[in-house]
Amino acid sequence: MTESHIDFRRAKFLISAPDIAHLDQYLPGDVGVEIAFAGRSNAGKSSALNALTEQKSLARTSKTPGRTQLINVFELDSQRRLVDLPGYGFAQVPLAMKNKWQQALGEYLQKRACLSGVVVLMDIRHPLKDLDMQMIQWAVASEIPVLALLTKSDKLAQSAKMKTVNEVRKALADFGDWVLVEPFSALKGTGKPKVLSILNEWCHPQWLRDELDTAEQSN
């Protein structure tokens, strides 16, 4: 079966949920394909989502990091969704709330069967903090591929940018093919075609291809 191209510009807001338990209440079960976006509260997650979907306000950007406490779900089509997870690791958030978020993030990564890939966004100037590594480890332990996206790459000169990209790739090399590392700039559009190509591939996991092949053969 030929792999179709997903038009990420068609993404539209579906629901918000305070945690994974409520997510199951709002969505039609743990089915279809989900791609999650996770990152520290200042990693530029909302800006990246808006740039990738070419929508200025699909994901609301906040001038106060740590404000996004909800899981926000955006629908690509009847089978595919983008999931904007709460930002983590912001110092001004109360410890109890911070721990609750981190527990919810871990639950989502470990228990969500329809999760096809995770984009872990990191400011290219401050990559691989402890919580970033924890997110990557959780995902890989659950056999979920990861795209480590180094955001705000326009903030560095080309030589410094590639030096950081290579250092991060080396640091994550033990994860093998489970983790890809790419630079990205929401402002300049740097890396956008590569990221969309990876997301498109994740939108077509093998189980879905097999399911569609079976449906085609029965018609």
From Swiss-Prot:
Q: Does the keyword Transferase apply?
A: no
Q: Which NCBIfam families match?
A: GTPase_YsxC
Q: Which GO terms describe its molecular function?
A: GTP binding; metal ion binding
Q: Which key words are in the record?
A: Cell cycle, Cell division, GTP-binding, Magnesium, Metal-binding, Nucleotide-binding, Septation
**Protein's UniProt name:** Probable GTP-binding protein EngB
Q: Lineage in the entry? A: Bacteria, Pseudomonadati, Pseudomonadota, Gammaproteobacteria, Alteromonadales
Supply the Gene3D superfamilies for this chain.
P-loop containing nucleotide triphosphate hydrolases
Write down the required cofactor(s). Mg(2+)
Cite the EngB-type G domain residue spans from the record: 31-205
Q: Which PANTHER family match?
A: ENGB-TYPE G DOMAIN-CONTAINING PROTEIN, MSS1/TRME-RELATED GTP-BINDING PROTEIN
A single GO BP term for this record reads: division septum assembly
The record's similarity note reads: Belongs to the TRAFAC class TrmE-Era-EngA-EngB-Septin-like GTPase superfamily. EngB GTPase family.
- Functional summary from the UniProt entry: Necessary for normal cell division and for the maintenance of normal septation.
Task: Extract the InterPro entries matched here.
Answer: G_ENGB_dom, GTP-bd, GTP-bd_ribosome_bio_YsxC, P-loop_NTPase
Q: Which HAMAP family match?
A: GTPase_EngB
Residues that coordinate or bind Mg(2+): 46, 68
Q: Name one GO cellular component term.
A: cytosol
Sites where the protein binds GTP: 39-46, 66-70, 84-87, 151-154, 184-186
